[in-house]
């Protein structure tokens, strides 16, 4: 069975982030497709958040517009400085990136927006970056 467009995009996004040396310099190998259980969380880390897929019918074929988020989590002494650096590295790695998807082709991947906030615990900072990608079936 062939992978669906959302899964193919997930695999490509995680691979791109893991290959990024700027991001790796801050988080090392802690780039996940889902968040680690809280008892095992080793800050800082990055993970895929939401993944919303919408079919877009164009003539006789269908593309998928996929909205997805990447979440950056940190507990630095310096406050939001580290989470902003992580967010910037994620944005640079994915905005207009030439991602290679198995069984599909990427029309585009664009950064949309980001939100940064401090958790109620007063120690954890989170940045959530939103992207949109258009994925078509490989021809």
Regions of interest found by a model, annotated:
Residues 1-60, 97-102:
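Small/polar-rich, solvent-exposed N-terminal microdomains that initiate assembly or binding
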Residues 5, 9, 82, 123:
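Conserved acidic
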Residues 53-56, 75, 117:
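Short beta-turn/strand-loop junction motif enriched in small, turn-promoting residues
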Residues 57-63, 119-124:
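Short, solvent-exposed beta-strand/turn "edge" segments of beta-rich domains on protein surfaces
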Residues 62-78, 125-135:
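Oligomerization/assembly interface segments of phage tail-like spikes and tubes
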Residues 73-93:
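Mid-chain, well-packed structural core segment of small domains
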Residues 91-139:
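Acidic-leaning, charged glycine-interspersed low-complexity segments
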């Amino acid at each position: 069975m062939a992978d669906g467009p959302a899964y193919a995009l997930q695999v490509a996004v995680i691979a791109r982030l893991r290959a990024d040396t700027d991001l790796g310099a801050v988080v090392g190998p802690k780039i996940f497709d889902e968040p680690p259980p809280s008892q095992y969380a080793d800050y800082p880390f990055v993970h895929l958040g939401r993944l919303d897929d919408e079919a877009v019918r164009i003539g006789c074929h269908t593309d998928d517009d996929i909205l997805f988020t990447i979440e950056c989590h940190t507990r630095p002494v310096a406050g939001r400085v580290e989470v902003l650096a992580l967010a910037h590295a994620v944005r640079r790695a994915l905005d207009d990136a030439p991602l290679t998807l198995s069984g599909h082709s990427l029309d585009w991947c664009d950064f949309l927006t980001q939100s940064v906030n401090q958790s109620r615990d007063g120690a954890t900072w989170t940045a959530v970056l939103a992207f949109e990608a258009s994925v078509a079936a490989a021809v």
